[in-house]
């Protein structure tokens, strides 16, 4: 499937599932990998604990390298935000999304879904935002990018994951 590599699609999926920034996702060490993961956010220094869906956890465990969950081709390094960004942009263009789409869009997808299910205050807590106005920008970002386009992007990412699983 053109657009995204499997590891980058998996990183985007983990960001969608947890609301974690892509930099935090990519810097996960294999030793941190469990169904309920705790990270210290690079940007804020705050702790975030999330339960990862079991099927996603299994795919992450399969994907993980010796040191990093998302290893780079360069020894001892993890994948970069820039590599994921390029893949996300390619996938967005495939579905005709010309608005700004980046790995951070995964965090917004998380916010939209979480706010619909649990309300703005819960989403603010989940994203570790100090200001609810910032959370509102994330949670209502689907009014800026239409749902059907976000669903198409999510579909492309799901296809990549399914293709990879089918080839095993």
Regions found by a protein language model. Give the residues of each.
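Basic, Lys/Arg- and aromatic-enriched nucleic-acid-binding interface segment
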Residues: 1-22
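Short, basic (Lys/Arg/His-rich) helix/loop patches that form interaction surfaces
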Residues: 2-8, 86-125
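The alpha-helix within a helix-turn-helix
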Residues: 15, 26, 124
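Conserved tyrosine-mediated DNA breakage-rejoining catalytic core shared by Y-recombinases
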Residues: 27-58
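Short, polar N-cap/turn motifs at the start of nucleic acid-interacting alpha helices
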Residues: 30-36, 119-139
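Catalytic-site neighborhood detector that most strongly recognizes the C-terminal catalytic loop/helix
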Residues: 41-45, 127-152
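DNA/chromatin major-groove-contacting recognition/catalytic segments
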Residues: 51, 55, 140-168
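Active-site/catalytic core of tyrosine-dependent DNA strand-transfer enzymes
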Residues: 54-98
């Amino acid at each position: 499937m053109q657009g995204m590599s499997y590891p980058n699609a998996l990183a985007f999926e983990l960001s969608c599932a947890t609301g974690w920034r892509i930099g935090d996702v990519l810097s996960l060490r294999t030793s941190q990998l469990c169904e309920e993961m705790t990270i210290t956010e690079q940007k804020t220094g705050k702790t975030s604990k999330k339960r990862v869906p079991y099927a996603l956890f299994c795919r992450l465990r399969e994907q993980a390298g010796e040191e990093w969950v998302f290893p780079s081709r360069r020894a001892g390094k993890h994948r970069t935000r820039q590599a994921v960004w390029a893949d996300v942009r390619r996938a967005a263009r495939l579905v005709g999304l010309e608005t700004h789409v980046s790995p951070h869009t995964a965090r917004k997808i998380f916010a939209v879904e979480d706010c619909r299910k649990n309300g703005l205050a819960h989403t603010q807590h989940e994203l570790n935002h100090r200001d609810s106005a910032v959370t509102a920008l994330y949670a209502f970002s689907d009014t800026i990018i239409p749902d059907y386009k976000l669903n198409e992007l999510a579909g492309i990412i799901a296809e990549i994951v399914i293709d990879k699983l089918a080839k095993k």
